[in-house]
Amino acid sequence: MTLAKGDIVGGCRVVRLLGTGGMGTVYEVERTDGGGGRYALKVFTRDHGDVDALRRRFLAEGKALQLLRHPNLLRVHELGEDAAIGLPYFVMDLVLGADGGVRTLADVEPGSVDEAHIARWYNQARSALEYIHAQGVVHRDVKLSNILINADGDAVLGDFGIARFTDVELRRELDVETTLEAVDADSRKVMGSVMYLAPELRRGEKATPASDAYALGVTFYRLLTGTWYEPGPVADGLIAEFGREWIRALRRILSAAPSARLPIPSVDLSRRPAKSRWLVVAVCAAVTAQIAAGVYMWMAGRMPRAAKPQAVHEYSFDQFFPSHTEQPQK
């Protein structure tokens, strides 16, 4: 069913429709209890498949977002089932772009924003993923359209509709001890969006933090290059080793750059475990970020050390991998 403007669900009045997904429909709403403010209301609308199991998964998503607390995650304030419509719902943060509409990374045209913004979004999305992984949650659907951009220009990770909960205590708290396993096993289907699937998921293996890292890599590869990622060899030994070697590889590549716009190096995300995949993605983002700031000239020895742009400290190696930051030699 579709709610109309003015309809009331869970103490909220519908203002407008924001969007429809596989599990539910999202509306902008305002409180009717005098609390003020506007929120997003997600209502379960699935009417096919194992509806009862999917309903429980929907509620598990809401409960999980109530428990998880991170500045780059959606926050759920209330969840329940409305007697009038007979459907479960949850009320969450309303995340709108600067223009008042819903904006995701899928709305960003490659090349339309500077790489500093992209590096910022990458850091925020990665931080959110590392947090949920530590809590025993695997997102399983990291992609451009599931990373929102708020009015402040920050990235917010959303849509936990097919998340996998690996922590035993969390599964019990969410009341998903057996239900979700049954849903996921249905027809041995692969959970997630095809273009973002890690090789192990295509083989039918379970999702892990490493597969989320792969999906994040594909997401930002697409955002940076405008093309879909295709596995390939590591270029010029890039990321062959941790530590200073990857900085040296960057310098070699940057020294040969004919202009301020450098193609993203070809990297093989499929052959790296979780920790290495984060590094691969970070280097790709860092390369373009450095170029945008003009740092490529400094790293290639074409700019005096004193002229190094301050921006390198704002979104560069320090944030990606503090332990692997190499200071320039005097």
Each language-model region and where it sits:
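Activation-segment/catalytic-loop signature of the eukaryotic protein kinase fold
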Residues: 79
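Conserved N-lobe ATP-binding subsite of Hanks-type protein kinase domains
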Residues: 25
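Conserved short submotifs of the Hanks-type protein kinase catalytic core
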Residues: 85-100
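Activation segment signature within eukaryotic-like protein kinase domains
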Residues: 121-122
